[in-house]
Structure formats: C-alpha cells, structure tokens
Amino acid sequence: MTSENEAAVSAAVAKLYDTYPFPPEPLIDEPPPGYNWRWHWPSAYSFCTGHAPHSNTIKILDAGCGSGVGTEYLVHLNPDAQVTGIDLSAGTLAVARERCQRSGADRVTFQQLSIYDVGQLEDRFDLINCVGVLHHMPDPIKGIQALATKLAPGGLLHIFVYAALGRWEISLMQQAIAMLQGEHRGDYRDGVQVGRQLFGALPETNRIVKRDKERWALENHQDECFADMYVHPQEVDYTIDTLFELIDASGLEFVGFSNPRYWDLNRLVGKSDDVMARAQTLGTREQYRLIELLDPELTHYEFFLSRPPLPQSDWSRSESLLSAIPSRHACMSGWPSKSFFDYDYQLVKLTDPEYDFLSRCADPGITDADTVAELIADTDFTLDDVRSLQRRQLIVLSPTIPTTP
C-alpha cells in the first residue's frame, strides 16, 4: 500500500470515529466500575512472569485510546503510573479528555497522533496497551513495529486483534452493506441506516441474523457499536498463521495469550488419549491452529509481547518459594469469602485451608510482610498448595531471591 493510500485509509478511519466516537460507554463522575486485570500492571506482570514487578512507578501508553474507556481504567488501576493516550480522531480524543477529567483520572496526557508516528513521543514505555487498533490500520505490521520501538526493556505490549473464524458472519454483512451503499460508501450514517434496514429485512432464520442476535445484538443496540462492527472502512481479521506473521514481524517475544483456558487442548479432545497424543506431536503454533479450527467461536486474540529481558519465576525451587512474600491478587470481586470471582470474573470456591492462608496473606501490593515459610509454619498447608494459588492467579508472589532472566 502506498503512502497516499495509507493516508486515505487513516483519514477514513478518523472520519468514522469523529462521526461515532468509540467506545460509547457513558461518562461518569467517579472511577469506572470493576477491573480488567490486563490493564493492572502488577496483575499483568505477574501473569507474564510469575512474580510481582519490582516497581509500580511506570510509564503506560494507550495506543489508539479512542474515547478513553481503557485509558481511565489504566489510570485508576495504576495509581503510581503516568499514562499517555494517543489517537487519530480529534473528536474521539475530546470525549477521552472529558471522560478522564470527570472520573478523576488526572495522571494522563492525550495527543492526536498516529501509531505510525509514535516515534515522536520522547518516552519509552513499560506497558503499551493497543486494543482493537492494529486490525484497523492500513499496514498493521508497520504499526506494530512502530510500537515495538517504544517498548522499554522488560516491558509488556498488550494487543487485541480480530479473529477471522469467529467473525465470519460479520465479514459477510460488512461486504453486503458496502455493496448496497455503492457510491455512498464512506457516509457512515448512511451505512448504519442501510445495515439496520438490511437486518430488519432478512428472515429470522437467516444465519447472519441468528448469529447477530445470539452474540452481538445487545452490544450493537448503539449506533457507535454497529458502525464500528459493520461499516468500518478498514479491517484485517487474523488466523493463527497470519497472527504469528504479525507477531514475528514485531521483533518482540511472544509471552502468551491472556485467555489460556481457551488454548487448553484438553478441554476439546481430552476424552481421547489417542487424539491427545497425536495433537501433542504438533508444534505449539500448530496446536493453537488446531484449537481454533475445532472451536471457531473465538472472535479476537488477546496476548502479551515483551522486549527482553523479562525475568521468569516458576517457583519450582522450594527455597525460592519459602522466602517469597505472597499478597492477595488485586483483581478479585467478593473477597473476603470462600466463594468469589477471580481476576477473570470466574467463580472460585476455596477450601477451608486455602481460605485461611489467603486471609493471612498481605493486602494487594504490600511487599513488606510475612513470607510463605512464616505463613505455613505450624500448618498443614503445603508448598504445592501455595503453587496452586499462584497458578490460579489468586496470589502474587514477590521474590526475595533474584529471579532468572
């Protein structure tokens, strides 16, 4: 794609979001509700490394921040961080500024800037958040490479891009609306009108209609969401193969998907020892491809990349685990209770010993507290029990013995 074409596509994308600022969540005069652990630095870092970060005083870039929904979470969930938000659309940035001002998110600066031009920013960032953006760029590889230059050593890049298999019906409707718009394509209000009329005209039994009602109807009640989904001027949907072409081009290291439950082969073919054995002979990326072929409901990929060195802790050494300081995970809803929602809003039911141990752990973020050895002394709670809590993201461990790069 030529630079002239890239500029034209970028202008069309900016026009869409000037017309329909996105996401359209209401502006409120208080911090946003709940949490997204991917936007909470200690939780994201612990997920990627197995241990707490050495510092929470970091710099965060929200690349393609839109109307600031994610940005205000990044500010409120990370009270020691300085946040920068950039976006192409001036209209959307105006909403983002008002949103953050009203919710008290005051450690943020905004700038109208393309991801392609992110090199104009002076800082390098410990956490870069890029959600729902790269797949709308005319050259996503150029975009991810630009972001990679601004990631600090040991930093994390969190990315969300669309998956082709789970968005098949969306792609068909996008093409149909574009055909019916004809010379009016690029008039996004007309596109929304055409799309609404088309959905109203199709039979109830139509596959596209059924999928929209099952998966998207509540979300697409608002025109901003409908426009973003069905009349966007630029979209790239990925498969595992093309996703890793994007990742490899970044020059960064793939840390992992942030929804590991989906990528567990056992949940799909675990009933057959023979099929599992055959699947396990495949390479890791081939296994990922097999999973998405067998469960094509996935509508997006969400994952972390890093710039080495990124120290890792697996807590297999008893000495390291005994000396570590455990704190409760910050992203839990309903604690204190033996039943609550975890970092991913999945229901957790603790045993009595697990509840007792978790109750005696430090509050989130506290690192000057009792070690694992001190907490399990004179109890029947084992190191394997502690490892289980850590694997389930119910505790965050702060090492006192140096971690391995």
Can you annotate each of these PLM segments?
Residues 156-208:
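Conserved class I S-adenosyl-L-methionine
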Residues 19, 29-58, 73:
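Conserved alpha-helix/loop element of class I SAM-dependent methyltransferases that forms part
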Residues 119-127:
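A short acidic, Gly/Pro-enriched loop at the edge of an enzyme's catalytic core
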Residues 89:
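Conserved SAM/SAH-binding beta-strand->alpha-helix loop
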Residues 268-294, 300, 347-405:
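Long, charge-rich, low-complexity alpha-helical segments
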Residues 67-79:
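Conserved SAM-binding loop of SAM-dependent methyltransferases across substrates and taxa
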